[in-house]
Amino acid sequence: MKSRLPAQVSLLSVLALVASFFVAATAPANATVSRTSLIVAMSADLDYLDPAATMDNAQWKITYPCYQRLVEYNGADTDVVPGLASSWKISDNNLIYTFTLKTGNKFSDGRVVDANAVKYTFDRLLKIAKGPADNFGDLKEVTVSNPTTVSFILKRTSPQFLYTLAGNYGGIVNPKVASKAVKGDMGQSYLANHTAGSGAFVLTEWKKGQYLKLRKNPYYAGQKPYFTSVIFKIVGDASSQRLQLAKGEIDIAEGIPTDQLASVGKTKGVVVVNQPSLTVDYLYINNTKGNPALSKKEVRQAISYALDYKGLIDVTQAGFATQMRGPIPVGMWGRDPNVFQYTTDYAKAKSLLASAGVSNLSIDLLYSSRKPWWASEALLIQDNLAKAGIKVNLKLTDYAAARQMIDKGAFDLSLGVWSPDYADPSMFMNFWFDSGSFGLAGNRSFYSNPAVDKLIREAANITDQKKRTELYIAAQKIVVDEAAYGYMYQKNYLLPMRSNIKGFVFNPMLEQIYNLQTMSKG
């Protein structure tokens, strides 16, 4: 992606300063929770903590502060800065990334973090070959020159490579894990419920169904955390979370429904963090394997004109979202701010259907209960499209079955949600539109256009950001005109917490993850 180029201020960091706000009522700090402890209420327990095996942000809230990475996201910004590495160089052919490690970093058992630990981490990740390994498909091998110098050799140009290292799966693992292997599992059973990193915290206790407890890593070389302990408490009932937050029995509540947050923000001593995220809700429109009518651009455009975007946002997100303008959300570079945006226009939708020679269209809408707002969203879309003369049959199924159907293309329409794994527009443009990535690989509308393939593939294989942006903008104009998806809305990140919690920084690439090492209580 980028070598140590001059830092750029991302659009999102500006938005976070300008658009974010706290809905709050100030009050003296409640002393119920110890000043040196932080208690976070979660709705459900976690299941698996190995950074080489989990792709779930819910697990990352534990693992991210317990590990360090070669590079880290820069506060609220989506650019990266040195982490365990003090610097790095990229070869002229963009295939070799060589990192120089800082000295003094140690794992939670006192072992020094060196180049061999870095190599062990990525060799292990690739051998385990689970979800996180997919982000390193371009990685050929890792070599060690000396204890503080490590090189990553790529198979091909990968402009996003540097950013993948800042993700949870880039956490450097203590090689002692090798001694914890059971039946050749490379320590997976051990790291499922332990941590082995050099981050500010270490997991010390996990009582299933009750809580997880982190304590300060005594060997952490960075800024010493304010909190001596952090407790992630399982509180399944939303009303209980709300009551405990109001009483000061917890510091942060993750499970309060969106439609309650406006009133929660008026509670004495409580604030609600509200900042733009990079998570989007969109509608898969099966271009090639669904109802034959959906292969016609005019029909897909009609669906896009029939969606009541404001109604969807108001009902499902209590107004805490913004209509998308094309596939790339605000805050991600490479976005075309002037690309066409569909508006609700039932007359236009009917006209497009007529011009396509389509009448009495009946299509299925697939969804699961994975997201609590999808049931109401499905009903709204059914009602919206009915106003344009399209009958929508709702098909509710379990999440696993829905994923299988989506992967096979056995649907007409389906609800979807997406957030990027790394800060690069390829996470949207190449995943969503490349005809070589049908199904769960990313292209869930089974969209195919050779012109778009050419643009996005070229963009994904060069490092010049200006040129990449030009290519992605050209592709955006096509996929919006062809209504490859229903581009619905970009969600806000909302988090209720006690007003005496200080220093929380939201990074859109680290949603549900806390910067525990720099947070405190006032």
Show where each model-derived region lies.
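Aromatic- and charge-enriched surface segment that lines or borders ligand/interaction sites
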Residues: 86-131, 145, 151-153, 244, ...
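Structural transition elements
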Residues: 201, 322-355, 372-373
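Detector for C-terminal structural segments
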Residues: 207, 306-334, 369, 373-382, ...
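Ligand-site clamp/hinge motif
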Residues: 217-263, 391
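N-terminal lobe/hinge region of extracytoplasmic solute-binding protein
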Residues: 41-92, 123, 196-198
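Alpha-helical secondary-structure segments
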Residues: 39, 114-121, 147-153, 199-200, ...
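Gly/Pro-rich hinge or "lid" segments in bacterial periplasmic/extracellular proteins
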Residues: 74-75, 167-225, 229, 346-347, ...
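Surface-exposed binding/hinge segments that line
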Residues: 100, 134-180
